Amino acid sequence: MQTEHVILLNAQGVPTGTLEKYAAHTADTLLHLAFSSWLFNAKGQLLVTRRALSKKAWPGVWTNSVCGHPQLGESNEDAVIRRCRYELGVEITPPESIYPDFRYRATDPNGIVENEVCPVFAARTNSALQINDDEVMDYQWCDLADVLHGIDATPWAFSPWMVMQAANSEARKLLSAFAQHN
């Protein structure tokens, strides 16, 4: 895979340039564009993934299905599709917007900062997973209600962006509705 970049944003969310992805994620991470996706199977179960230990930020942490950064000229939806293929080896239904204005800043235990405008999407797959071990070290298909209960009970076990997304009542309602419509 070619070198990925992030799209830098000003405080109003307007693109101002690009920076190589790994150079962008430091203790002083600039605001940039990302996306987050929750992937469901035909049973309405959510794919929860555990980030590979080689990941720069939040290694070994459980998170929603796929996250990443759109490339210059690429739509968020196309970026979700690209990363699902790359990380999980699956084809998905067209991603649906769940939480379009999600924005967060969080610092991992190693001091790496995420500072992102990060629209949230949901999609479905019926494909068998072909996990990329460089991205994902473990995964589980779970009922959404069980995942949300786990996040509420033990937020420290999940990525901060997943916890913050699940804390939004409208996003939670839309994810629940999405899971139920197989």
UniProtKB/Swiss-Prot annotation:
SUPFAM superfamilies: Nudix (SSF55811). GO terms for molecular function: isopentenyl-diphosphate delta-isomerase activity; metal ion binding. Coiled coil: none annotated. Binds 1 Mg(2+) ion per subunit. The magnesium ion binds only when substrate is bound. Binds 1 Mn(2+) ion per subunit. The active site is at C67, E116. Mg(2+) binds at C67, E87. It is an enzyme of class 5 (isomerase). Pfam families: NUDIX (PF00293). Its EC number is 5.3.3.2. It catalyses: isopentenyl diphosphate = dimethylallyl diphosphate. Its cofactor is Mg(2+); Mn(2+). Mn(2+) binds at H25, H32, H69, E114, E116. Belongs to the IPP isomerase type 1 family. HAMAP family: Idi. NCBIfam families: IPP_isom_1, PRK03759.1. PANTHER family: ISOPENTENYL-DIPHOSPHATE DELTA-ISOMERASE. Homodimer. This is Isopentenyl-diphosphate Delta-isomerase. It comes from Shigella boydii serotype 4 (strain Sb227). The lineage of its organism: Bacteria, Pseudomonadati, Pseudomonadota, Gammaproteobacteria, Enterobacterales. The gene is idi.
